[in-house]
């Protein structure tokens, strides 16, 4: 193209405010510059914090995000996977769910890069990004025990299957064994999910049947707030009558009264890293590699006291 012609074309582009058509561009380079993230629920603080990290990393590379909420249902998940295939997304983040074999097979047949974030994978070839749930829960239980609590209840959401499969339950139980403390029936309560209402129901069960509890460890901050609500309904003060500890360190943990002592997992950073792994893979910088384990820390606030 001659210099004069090129200059005229660029001038016309500027005057008409022309923008390249994203669909047409994707047809040429076989990329849509779109990532998808699949959650069981999008109305909680966990999903919002993770999504913020994913979106920031994607936006910096000119990618957009499609968010899918499955409700944890098999049929809805498969429907979304079919939809994402039709939309030709460049990568998928499977968040806070179990990656069943049929999901993994479907995605891999389409050759769509995939990572699992804060969930379980049935396929060891799929990279996972998560905290060491067993160690985190062990540390939390040991922390409460070190403060003199010997009768500690636990509430956890059952998204990952049986208690034996759930790392947070294993860590809680191991801490009790290592400190010579026996767990009694009903001391660990399995709930359907990790929401506030699940914490309320689980808290009511614990406090009605195990009246000698001095602390409750909940496997999410929203569960912990539900426990605090259940305690308040029974006339119990937190932490004077009952200490409550959560997991995640969502923004609401420091907004509640009293502010919640919790286990912090770096959710924003986990989301950002998950997106970055996919983006680096797509750009040929590095292949999807090994699993990534993130550290956790205990954030001490005012919902736990020494016995």
What are the language-model segments listed below?
Residues 56-104:
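Central regulatory/effector-binding core of bacterial HTH transcription factors
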Residues 20, 29-43, 61-63:
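Interdomain hinge and pocket-entrance segments immediately C-terminal to HTH DNA-binding domains
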Residues 15-21, 75, 95-97, 200, ...:
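Short gly/ser/thr-rich secondary-structure transition/capping motifs
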Residues 15, 56-61, 85, 109-116, ...:
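Bacterial carbohydrate/catabolite-sensing allosteric modules
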Residues 41-44, 71-72, 157-163:
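Short histidine/acidic/glycine/proline-rich micro-motifs that form metal-
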């Amino acid at each position: 193209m001659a210099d004069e012609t090129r200059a005229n074309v660029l001038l016309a582009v500027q005057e008409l405010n022309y923008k390249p058509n994203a669909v047409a561009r994707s047809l040429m380079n076989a990329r849509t510059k779109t990532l998808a993230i699949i959650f069981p629920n999008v109305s909680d603080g966990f999903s919002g914090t993770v999504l913020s990290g994913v979106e920031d990393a994607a936006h910096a590379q000119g990618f957009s995000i499609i968010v899918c909420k499955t409700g944890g249902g098999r049929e809805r998940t498969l429907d979304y996977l079919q939809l994402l295939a039709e939309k030709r997304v460049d990568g998928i983040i499977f968040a806070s769910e179990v990656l069943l074999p049929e999901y993994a097979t479907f995605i891999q047949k389409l050759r769509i890069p995939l990572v699992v974030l804060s969930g379980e994978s049935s396929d060891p070839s799929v990279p996972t990004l998560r905290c060491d749930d067993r160690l985190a829960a062990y540390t939390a239980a040991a922390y409460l025990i070190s403060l003199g609590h010997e009768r500690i209840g636990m509430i956890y959401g059952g998204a990952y299957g049986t208690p034996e499969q759930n790392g947070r339950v294993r860590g809680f139980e191991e801490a009790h064994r290592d400190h010579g403390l026996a767990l009694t029936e009903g001391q660990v309560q399995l709930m359907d999910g990790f929401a506030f209402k699940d914490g309320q129901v689980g808290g009511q069960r614990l406090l009605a049947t195990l009246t000698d509890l001095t602390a409750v460890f909940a496997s999410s901050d929203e569960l912990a707030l539900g426990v605090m609500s259940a305690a308040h309904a029974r006339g119990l003060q937190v932490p004077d009558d009952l200490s409550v500890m959560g997991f995640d360190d969502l923004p609401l943990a420091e907004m509640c009264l009293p502010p919640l002592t919790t286990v912090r997992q770096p959710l924003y950073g986990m989301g950002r890293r998950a997106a970055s792994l996919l983006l680096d893979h797509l750009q040929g910088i590095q292949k999807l590699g090994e699993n990534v384990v993130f550290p956790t820390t205990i954030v001490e606030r005012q919902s736990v006291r020494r016995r």
